[in-house]
Amino acid sequence: GLPAFQTSIEPTDLHTANIKLNKIGQIIESHAQTFRPSGRTREYHAITRGWIVNELFRRVDPAGRTIGEFVEASIYQPLQADIFVGVKSADLSRVTPVKMLSGKFQFWESFKPSFMGRRMENNFFQTAGKLARLVPSMRQRTTKGAPSPFVGMQNIDFFNDPAIVQGETPSANTNATARGLARVAAAMAMKG
C-alpha cells in the first residue's frame, strides 16, 4: 500500500536523531495506501519498506533504537564487522561512491560469453526477457507520477550525497566492507 510517498523527503529526515523525532513516522501516518487498478495488493516497496520497518522496529525495541543503532550495537561492535545502516560522519571518508555503468558498456558486455569473463549476470537476451516480463506490471504500478523519494534527487548518483549515506534506509542504503559481510556470514554459518 505504500510503494512510494506522494511527497519527497529531506535526506536529513532519515538521520537517527530525526527518525527519533518521528519525522518519517508522521509522513507514513499521513499517507493513504494505494493499490493497482487491477486489484492486486502487492507492489515493490524498495525504499519505503526500509522506512516502514525502521518505524516498526523502533516502536517494539525495548530501548527504542533504530535499526541502524541495533546493527551498530549487536553486529558492528561485537563482531568488529564494518556494517552500517547510516554511516557516521567520522566514517564518511571510508565510503566508496556508487558509480553507474554506462548503457553502452552494459550493452556490449552483455554479449560476452560468461566463460570469457562477462561482468554481468545476464546476457542481452536474458535481460531483454526480464524487461519484457516487467513491462505489463510497470504500466499498472501506483508509483507512476510519484515524486522522487528525496528532495533534490535527480539520478542514482544522489545516493553518494553524504546526507543520504548518513541516513537510515535499511532496505536500500546499508554500507559494508567485504570483510564485514564475511564476519556476519561466518557468525550465521556457526549459528551465532
For each feature predicted by the language model, list its residue ranges.
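Active-site helix/loop module of the DD-peptidase/beta-lactamase fold
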Residues: 1-4, 10, 30-32, 59-133
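Active-site-proximal loop and beta-strand segments within enzyme catalytic domains
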Residues: 1-47, 55
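Generic detection of long, well-ordered alpha-helical segments
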Residues: 18, 64-65, 175-178
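Flexible glycine/proline-enriched surface loops and loop-helix/loop-strand junctions
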Residues: 31-39, 50-51, 161-170
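Conserved aromatic-histidine-acidic binding/catalytic patches
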Residues: 37-45, 62, 169-176
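Alpha-helical scaffold elements that line and support the substrate/ligand-binding pocket
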Residues: 45-75, 79, 180-188
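Penicillin-binding protein/beta-lactamase superfamily catalytic region
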Residues: 89-192
